[in-house]
């Protein structure tokens, strides 16, 4: 893995521990929530964005977003498991999660998204963390950013996650967390959920660090 990917990975893993700790310590009914997370009653659903034919964004040096999302997510799962958290992966290989006869890429993407939503919503006591990489037509943008669902607890969790990413990865990052408007997965889930854009694949300087 390239150095920049390792840097993003370590920052994301550290942030995961921090935001879950913050969620447990400072949210209402803190002792109950933290006990549920560490005891395994709460399930952290980890969603590596894209997969299979849908590679997501492609970095300036050819890095596929889907593969990087999966690598980060698998390591995040391992870290959270070591911390006593119960996890569930949306996917564990570089494959999409569509089902049924899908004749086109568009149909596969629709099926894939619906299956992700169903998996999250059928998981009792779920807390969703969706992992993605950002991309923009201009290469000057950088930094991680957290987006949140409209469900209870999501905005507060996103704020703490954004701060944790800033502390662990990029002290100069001044990006603010935002509502994930028009993101199908985040609009359809019923549980607390955030989407983490770990960095910009379109930023060559960030990639080379």
Which residues are covered by each model-predicted region?
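Catalytic-site microenvironment of enzymes
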Residues: 1-209
């Amino acid at each position: 893995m390239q150095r920049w990917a390792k840097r993003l990975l370590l920052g994301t893993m550290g942030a995961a521990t921090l935001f879950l700790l913050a969620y447990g310590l400072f949210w209402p009914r803190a002792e109950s929530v933290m006990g549920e997370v560490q005891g395994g009653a709460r399930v952290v659903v980890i969603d590596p964005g894209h997969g299979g034919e849908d590679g997501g964004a492609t970095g300036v040096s050819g890095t596929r977003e889907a593969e990087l999302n999966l690598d980060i997510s698998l390591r995040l799962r391992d870290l959270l498991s070591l911390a006593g958290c119960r996890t569930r992966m949306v996917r564990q290989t570089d494959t999409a999660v569509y089902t049924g006869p899908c004749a086109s890429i568009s149909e596969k993407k629709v099926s894939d998204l619906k299956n992700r939503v169903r998996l999250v919503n059928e998981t009792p006591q779920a807390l969703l963390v969706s992992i993605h990489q950002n991309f923009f037509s201009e290469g000057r943008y950088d930094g991680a950013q957290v987006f949140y669902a409209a469900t209870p607890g999501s905005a507060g969790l996103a704020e703490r996650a954004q701060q944790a990413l800033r502390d662990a990865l990029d002290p100069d990052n001044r990006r603010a967390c935002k509502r994930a408007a028009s993101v199908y997965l985040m609009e359809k889930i019923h549980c607390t959920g955030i989407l983490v854009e770990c960095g910009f694949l379109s930023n060559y300087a960030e990639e080379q660090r």
